[in-house]
Amino acid sequence: MSRTRRFVTLLARLRELHPELADPLPEIRRGHVLLSGIPVTNPAALVPRDGSVALRVQEPLRGERKLQAVLTRFGVGVDGIVAVDVGAAAGGFTFALLHAGAARVYAVDAGHGQLRGSLRQDPRVVVLERTNISALTTALVPESVDLITVDLSYLSVAEAAPQLNRLDIRASARLVALIKPMFELGLPGLPADDRLADAIDHAVRGVVDAGWRDPEWMRSPIAGGRGATEFLLHARRG
């Protein structure tokens, strides 16, 4: 038997094993593909046709657990909706939305290259990288939006909320925003516990002024960076 029949490229083998992946290359290059338990990042590497090739099981993203908690707490239905995830980063919120049944998620982030490869390849995800919240319009999101999630650094929820009004937001839409007290209050470091209520009040006022109603909040089940206390704010549009 010839060598070419016994060996195939890693890329070809992964396509055979996982035809659901539209583009396996990002998974390979990020070290998510294992050959006999060892990460291989060269898509042209020759592997035995009967070799053990597997996708690495990825740890849940922190944002995933945060969003799951608030969706459950406030009874936010996601099945079949169109959502915009502002500050998508690695995609914790985006993943949670898809897992809950969202039909489409616009994953918006000012940076680039952070979103997990599996999410990039998902046909339900529209990736809008290098896109600041101030640039969001119906030209970028040409659909009516049912849910907006916000997880931003260096910008308060109060400042972010009015910038969302350039989108076509349904009257039945919901908003979920992660309140980071340090950024909400414009502080150089983590605020004292007695300032946390001020941060929540600031975010709530900004959201209400931007046209949302019935704001309610909960403490995030997971701390932020450096152990920072964070809160999840939920509000309705109509």
Locate predicted features:
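Conserved beta-strand signature within the Rossmann-like core of class I S-adenosyl-L-methionine
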Residues: A171-G186
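Core SAM-dependent methyltransferase catalytic element
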Residues: I222-G238
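Conserved S-adenosyl-L-methionine
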Residues: W212-I222
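S-adenosyl-L-methionine
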Residues: Y106-E159
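Conserved alpha-helix/loop element of class I SAM-dependent methyltransferases that forms part
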Residues: R62-I81
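A basic, amphipathic helix-loop patch mediating RNA/tRNA/ribosome contacts
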Residues: M1-R49, V82
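Conserved SAM-binding loop of SAM-dependent methyltransferases across substrates and taxa
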Residues: A90-G101
